[in-house]
Amino acid sequence: MQKSPLERASVISKLFFSWPGPILRKGYRQHLKLSDIYQIPSVDSADNLSEKLEREWDRELASKKNPKLINALRRCFFWRFVFYGILLYLGEVTKAVQPLLLGRIIASYDPDNKVERSIAIYLAIGLCLLFIVRTLLLHPAIFGLHHMGMQMRIAMFSLIYKKTLKLSSRVLDKISIGQLVSLLSNNLNKFDEGLALAHFVWIAPLQVTLLMGLIWDLLQASAFCGLAFLIIVALGQAGLGRMMMKYRDKRAGKINERLVITSEMIENIQSVKAYCWEEAMEKMIENLRQIELRLTRKAAYVRYFNSAAFFFSGFFVVFLSVLPYAMLKGIILRKIFTTISFCIVLRMAVTRQFPWAVQTWYDSLGAINKIQDFLQKQEYKTLEYNLTTTDVVMENVTAFWEEGFGELFEKAKQNNNNREISNGDNSLFFSNFSLLGAPVLKDINFKIERGQLLAVAGSTGAGKTSLLMMIMGELEPSEGKIKHSGRISFCSQFSWIMPGTIKENIIFGVSYDEYRYRSVIKACQLEEDISKFAEKDNIVLGEGGITLSGGQRARISLARAVYKDADLYLLDSPFGYLDVLTEKEIFESCVCKLMANKTRILVTSKMEHLKKADKILILHEGSSYFYGTFSELQTLRPDFSSELMGYDSFDQFSAERRNSILTETLRRFSLEGDTVSWNETKKQSFKQAGEFGEKRKNSILNSINSIRKFSVVQKTPLQMNGIDEDSDEPLERRLSLVPDSEQGEAILPRSNVINTGPTFQRRRRQSVLNLMTRPSINQGQNIHRRTAASARKMSLAPQANLTEMDIYSRRLSQDSGLEISEEINEEDLKECFFDDVENMPPVTTWNTYLRYVTVHKSLIFVLIWCLVVFLAEVAVSLVVLYLLRTSSLQDKGNNTTVNANSSYGVIVTNTSSYYLLYIYVGIADSLFALAIFRGLPLVHTLIKVSKTLHHKMLRSILQAPMSTFNTLKAGRILNRFSKDIAILDDLLPLTMFDFIQLLLIVIGAVVVVSVLQPYIFLATVPVIAAFIILRAYFLHTSQQLKQLESEARSPIFTHLVTSVKGLWTLRAFGRQPYFETLFHKALNLHTANWFLYLSTLRWFQMRIEIIFVIFFIAVTFVSILTTGEGEGTIGIILTLAMNIMNTLQWAVNSSIDVDSLMRSVSRIFKFIDMPTEESKPAKSVKPPKDGQLSKVMIIENQHVKKDYNWPSGGHMTVKDLTAKYIDGGNAILENISFSISPGQRVGLLGRTGSGKSTLLSAFLRLLNTEGEIQIDGVSWDSITLQQWRKAFGVIPQKVFIFSGTFRKNLDPYEQCSDQEIWKVADEVGLRSVIEQFPGKLDFVLVDGGYVLSHGHKQLMCLARSVLSKAKILLLDEPSAHLDPITYQIIRRTLKQAFADCTVILCEHRVEAMLECQQFLVIEENTVRQYDSIQKLLNEKSLFRQAISPLDRMKLLPHRNSSRHRSRSQIAALKEETEEEVQETRL
């Protein structure tokens, strides 16, 4: 970056903003890069600004009980704010004085007033000087205020980030990532541009007072008629604004609903294609879009009338001011023209400036209050440690989720004793509730000495991670003691990767030691992976390690923890994503050898790890089930596995575990006795409650894709609210958990940033804490979305006791990754969305405009109609002018004066004919602007265009090949459907309408002036030419700067989300200062771009104004020097010239806005033009001899499965299959050939990342493939894609449940009857689950079906496959996140429902492979072995290495016995389970 020319710029250069000249020249000639941007001045650096504000905020906290952020801001910025306010006021005063001089100039042309004619030229000079002074005052003032707003935003951004790093885990559990981003973007962007309007809250009233005084001098009391009318217009506009908000609020829910389904579709596009659900998804989204557009139209009409009211008021305000005075006393022309000029300024002050200023203050103070409350939240308390301690000791430790939870529970139970629950089963609710009242850990005791390994085991939700949290100080015990040295290293359960190189991720700011680094890389099995990258360990990883596999991320995370030299290593299930072989090697070489002298606590569920541990701690429902050695465990607790896991059978699950499915259901229905109708629930299931108590604006951002554990209540093993630390802070600064009054107003204080009422706790689902505790699959890519459940509207308890219930329900609500926008709204749209770098032309091309206009044929007719109406208006005006001029000449010729007593009354003066002209001037802009027949059809048609474009884009996305999605970020696709479609719906129609209106007003005024004074036309031509050249020159650079600014905004939010996801790791490693520095760097980069954009914008605005001032000077002097007698002509010319000046500037700005918004259109066209999948057969098929398959030829690309005979058996032949993710990319699989007999079961084996899942995708033609596959003799080249995919049933690794009913999820095309669905649900063990929900099959699942465990979702995928009657079943790691019970159900279903199907299974678990007859071993992109289990066990294969000798002995007998013995299902299930316990993760 270069040094900014601002630092050495002269005063003149700063005053006229000529210092950004070089960058404008460069941007016009060539493409701007980041290196071309100037460095920021030191006064704008985030370090300086945040330090200044932090100092004042700390002062505020120290000195007052009730600290106010606005006081800290005042001490930092107040005097500069006042100075710029005064400049702004002086600039505005000149506008009020201009009409006075105008009046005097007009008066000097009165034939009776020849005395003043001599000073007309001096009056004109005075008028022109006023314009020059105004230009010189206004622009520096506005720029100064924008600059100051930017500084305030930077300081607050930094303060919020620093606070986020200090928040206690308990507070983090109450805040969603959506709220954090919303706090930064939606609230803080108000300061950047809003500050310039803030002063009008006092300037506008002063301006109105001054103007009314001046108009009173002219018209006496009748002046107030015009003001009264303007106030009525302003109030009317406020009413219309409220009506518009009402429509938009209604629409917000629909937009949200559409975006949720769209993001689910994009995120799971692979599943959508695998299931052939493209048409079903399109229909669902289009139906929602229809409803949304109806509301969009209504809102647009209201907004159109609101906009038209401003123009329309121009004529009436003058008319109402002048008419009463003229009727009573008569009026001279000078007064009319002066009044018109005064009224133009008055109208702006009353209907625009003052309402905007009030809105700005309202928004800004609201934002400051939210930030203030956030800054006062409870902080993470660093524990005091004894550095000399070598042991790790826990004595009688107990911890609760919430302080005082037990008491709250008792109170809630008493208050609800007599209430009926909607399904009438009281026990369900309270069995869950008692669980929630229990401590997360109770009476934990253990002691481990230096160098020992403690293995912590237990079922999901037993409190394993909470134990590690407590050691780290994230969760404070309510009783008991913890002792250790405090030198901790931590490896999280779900690997966290920061943006940077692999090396930076492992070293993580610790000093570099080559030998240690190499040892760690070797022990964590990373050598081979690193050697594959061209840049080795210096390869830059994207957000969340997007380019790495899950196993690679897990190993880097582990390497980071091991590299740090600590006394105690906390490893939270570090092997979750590793294959058996890698896990075994890392456990031995890293955990047992490399770290042998260190104290380690390992959360695990593997029997081998328990055997090798020095001590074992088994947790069950928060209590210590067992503590001791492995031999003691076998002696004392021989039944530990079945007891802990509930292996005996599903029915013998503990009540808590079984009912976890129901807990969210209960939240949806009122406990008050009146049941809520199902339809109502359905309506509300997408409704978003306000995010911060008042209208929350949008925030849609890329987030993570959560995978959920089996239990809903105990699902995160992390329960991490923490306990309220004993804080020295005053009570007001801490979160109050218990309401002050019995009425239970809110859980947090009223002004709290995140919660202004009890609704928040019920509707929170994805807290920041959950974000930290979820695994990420393609973290940076996957959009995660959340919609509120109906719980947001239905209380769980009577209103008075809501607060206690909220705490209960918050614990239940876990899953989801993101707050989807409450309202897609105006300028905020641009804030939160960050796109990849796109090669967009600097200025929107004419081709885009032409294509946009021709999208809908009626748009062309509407535009032609607009032009016709306009030409008619201009023609009428010219005719009127001609008639007036003729009558004026006749008047002069006859030299007659009409008597005041004649029928005309007192209005008529000796310049009567010109009086009529005033009506034209007054009505000119009203007539052009209102033109209701022109405006409404335009807005209506532009919304139709938006509808068509959305439809085309959706179809294009659904038909795009998977390679497109491999190169496109999901966030970018969702931005098209959210940000860009919202721009097309909301901003573009009205901005375009405004631009067309303003342009026509200017043209109309120029024509009138030119007719009256032809010389002026000569001055107009160069002005218009200058304006066009200047606009083109400026646009080239400004759009590039905007693009760079948008790209620079992305790292700020990415860094925030990344920091929050890795917060425990950050704090365990003490890296907060390093991350604050990185955040400040990201802020400074954004500031450099934004400041330069603001400066170039001011450069442009000032140049435009200078051109207009020159134009006005020319017009004034030409008029004065060439006009003869008669005040009418000079009055019209000067009044219109002043009007042209203001309007043309507005028109120029509108044209820039239109160009900017049209970029959204060009982005959408890019998506519409994407290539599509080849759905037609690649070659024709010869009719088979037996005639059986002839019907294949006539199946068209229909999604409905017809009962033809293909596929009949499921015989599959693969020949020379090669697969790539993208065209021209490296082959992921090469020359794969094998054959599978009908009904055979084949297991895929291979290390992590060997290509097993890729092979399954290749079967479905989801990749770029070469070679051939045949099913029952039919080649994939001979039939359509849809038909081919229909042959397969799929259970993907990433389960797809979209927002909709159970029925829709199982059968989106609605082909099956209820009986068929229930029969299949019975077969797969889903019936009992579905029947527990109200509405049964019609129960609406939202948030990816968060009320279901991962196992139940897998069962739904299984049911889909059974319903599709597929002959070949593909299973991609179905047991990865399953508890043993659900896994057994899946195994049983596979045996029964798919007995005669071909099954291809990809698995990590050895025991999962027991049913397979053949095994396909994939290594180095190709088939290494394809054989039966016996041969693989005899040879030296990967399969043989992966399992222990003991298991090897078991495998063959197990297969034989299980195939030949017949026994009852339950007995078989039980026996199999017990045999497998050795391998199963607890």
Swiss-Prot record:
UniProt PTM: N-glycosylated.
Positions of ATP binding: 458-465, 1246-1253
Lipidation (S-palmitoyl cysteine): C524, C1397
Gene Ontology CC, one term: chloride channel complex
Chain residues that bind ATP 1: W401, S434, G458, S459, T460, G461, A462, G463, K464, T465, Q493
Membrane topology of this protein: Multi-pass membrane protein
Membrane side Cytoplasmic: residue ranges: 1-77, 147-195, 244-298, 359-858, 941-991, 1036-1096, 1153-1482
CDD domains referenced in this protein's UniProt entry, alphabetically: ABC_6TM_CFTR_D1, ABCC_CFTR1
Region called Interaction with GORASP2, residue ranges: 1388-1482
GO terms (BP aspect): bicarbonate transport; cellular response to cAMP; cellular response to forskolin; chloride transmembrane transport; intracellular pH elevation; membrane hyperpolarization; multicellular organismal-level water homeostasis; response to endoplasmic reticulum stress
Region (Disordered R region): 654-831
This protein's UniProt keywords: ATP-binding, Cell membrane, Chloride, Chloride channel, Endoplasmic reticulum, Endosome, Glycoprotein, Ion channel, Ion transport, Isomerase, Isopeptide bond, Lipoprotein, Membrane, Nucleotide-binding, Nucleus, Palmitate, Phosphoprotein, Repeat, Transmembrane, Transmembrane helix, Transport, Ubl conjugation
Quaternary state and interactors: Monomer; does not require oligomerization for channel activity. May form oligomers in the membrane. Interacts with SLC26A3, SLC26A6 and NHERF1. Interacts with SHANK2. Interacts with MYO6. Interacts (via C-terminus) with GOPC (via PDZ domain); this promotes CFTR internalization and thereby decreases channel activity. Interacts with SLC4A7 through NHERF1. Found in a complex with MYO5B and RAB11A. Interacts with ANO1. Interacts with SLC26A8. Interacts with AHCYL1; the interaction increases CFTR activity. Interacts with CSE1L.
Swiss-Prot/TrEMBL domain comment: Binds and hydrolyzes ATP via the two cytoplasmic ABC transporter nucleotide-binding domains. The two ATP-binding domains interact with each other, forming a head-to-tail dimer. Normal ATPase activity requires interaction between the two domains. The first ABC transporter nucleotide-binding domain has no ATPase activity by itself.
Family classification: Belongs to the ABC transporter superfamily. ABCC family. CFTR transporter (TC 3.A.1.202) subfamily.
Protein name per its UniProtKB record: Cystic fibrosis transmembrane conductance regulator
Organism expressing this protein natively: Loxodonta africana (African elephant)
Organism placement in taxonomy: Eukaryota, Metazoa, Chordata, Craniata, Vertebrata
